[in-house]
Amino acid sequence: MKFAILFGGNSYEHEISIVSAVVLKKVINQNLEFIFCDEERRFYHIPSEKMNSKTFSTKAYKKEKELFIKQGGFFSKGFLKENKLECECVINLIHGRDGEDGKIAALFEFYSIKFIGPRLEASVLSFNKELTKLYAKSVGVKTLDYTMVRKGQNSKEKLSFPCIIKPARLGSSIGISIVKDEKDLEYAKDVGFEFDNDLVVEEFKNNIKEYNLAGCMINDEFVFSIIEEPKKKEFLDFEQKYLSFSGHNELIEANLSEELKEKLKDSFKKIYNPLFKGALIRCDFFILDNEIYLNEINPNPGSLANYLFKDFSTTLNALADQISLEKMIKISYNFLHSINGQKGKL
């Protein structure tokens, strides 16, 4: 299977998406194409040998072929004709806005482009933390209690401390603050409101454990990664979350009982099926007093969480093989023809 990796986007996580693509280039041992979406949402075909940080930080990518999207794929302008970029499946590796909020999913579905990544409905529900909590509750997965704080509205709910404040629509740890007492609350809210008009506030739990589990569905069977217990400080910050996914060090599976492992996998299944079919996702869970709570869904995890899988390439190819395009509706115009053949034409 020949893949094209789409990365970049107009997102706060633009640079991290570049790092993610460079890492994945080293992991996937097969022929790849690279499509860069810059901050103006223009697409460029990046040669494999130029997949490095300098190409993007110096804007040298603008010297490469610009691509445009239309029915069936990505194309570049040739001397006499348009040239289609040869690939069988696109990997959506744009983190945050554009890649995880549904824009790319809608674009690919509209233009009949086969891709690995969350579909439109899955993107919308996983990108907004408030909607994620409501969705998790609907499928029987617990989340921590929360309060919504909205810009321009005076919240009447009394907050307890310490608490953690998160922008509702941001696919990373950006804009998150731990507030230990009321005197720090307004500053933390101001930080969060720089990124979103809606904030999720949760009670901060000191004795909570976090575990990550990635997976996908292939031919109606779940394929799981190992379960990871990330090393962290008070919470998983931006650098920890994204600069540790290159897989240079061998991961050791979390030391959990078989009962808790099965509980985590069962919660993952409830979240994934059927909404996230076609995507390889990572769910971040909390365990508190032997109870499982969903923290967040990562629909496009850093470098597709390759470091958590024992045979990532095989999993990726098998996932791509079973993805099918939406069936096009045949328009016959019979109704309009019938009107046209009658008196009093439309």
UniProtKB/Swiss-Prot annotation:
PROSITE patterns: ATP_GRASP, DALA_DALA_LIGASE_1, DALA_DALA_LIGASE_2. It is found in: Cytoplasm. Its cofactor is Mg(2+); Mn(2+). InterPro entries: ATP-grasp, ATP_grasp_subdomain_1, D-Ala_lig_Van_CS, D_ala_D_ala, Dala_Dala_lig_C, Dala_Dala_lig_N, PreATP-grasp_dom_sf. Its EC number is 6.3.2.4. Belongs to the D-alanine--D-alanine ligase family. This is D-alanine--D-alanine ligase. It comes from Campylobacter jejuni subsp. jejuni serotype O:23/36 (strain 81-176).
